[in-house]
Amino acid sequence: LESYVALFDAAAALTGEPGIALQYGEAVRMQEVSIVGLICEACERTADVGVELNRYAALVVDEDRGEPATLMRGAWQDGNVWIEMPDNALTRDFRMVEAEFARLVWNGRVMFANEPAFRAIRYPGEIHFRHPDPGYRTEYERVFQAPVVFESHWNAMQVDPEFLTLKQPPVNRYVFGILSERADALLKALQATTTTHGRVESALIPVLPRVDVGTDDAAA
């Protein structure tokens, strides 16, 4: 993630556009950069997207822990439905936060551009950021087309409850299964290199045919 942020810094300096992270999130769909995005695109309902996103969070956020992170979660506050980005590696730099919220918003707008039920609601209704105004509020307003609140107590966006009932454009369920199977394999491989148990197993696998030793023996 440090390299990701450094790229935003370099791009902003070279282009003279401080809001380039917002523009990146607006223009580049998650399915263009990650298998997790393809899985989310293949979900049947919008309500399923958060489940799959958090399931494969370790493939999106490199926290070097091999543990699942919560990238997005639903919340109910003051009678409204919100999608919150809780504290995780993505929230350590405000450019990551603005890029991912811009991506989330525009993924929805592009996906449901021809859906009457989506066009009938406001998406998002409002959006909150914990960081202060970085100096380009008008770009935030252009990208999100909704009221923007800085220095809030959370990073979150308000959505119409109807949004969570929308069915996504149909995708072959076989494709969804293949993508999930591949992502599970990638997740397992990642965990094998980031957890203590996985590192021990990886070290022992080359000698297992020659030496009768198991992970329990190694731990002892």
Q: What do the PLM-derived regions correspond to, one by one?
A:
Residues L1-N80, E84:
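N-terminal low-complexity or simple alpha-helical regulatory segments
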Residues S3, R45, V49, R92, ...:
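Short amphipathic alpha-helical segments
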Residues Y4, I35, A42, D93, ...:
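Residue-level recognition of alpha-helical structural elements
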Residues S34-C40, P86-L90, T165, L186-L187:
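Short hinge/gating elements
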Residues L53, V97-L104, F176-A183:
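Short amphipathic C-terminal alpha-helix that caps PH/PH-like domains
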Residues L59-E67, A113-F118, L190:
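Active-site phosphate-binding and catalytic loops of NTP-dependent enzymes
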Residues A69-L164:
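DNA-contacting interfaces and partner/effector-binding or oligomerization modules
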Residues P134-A220:
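Extended mid-to-C-terminal alpha-helical interaction segments
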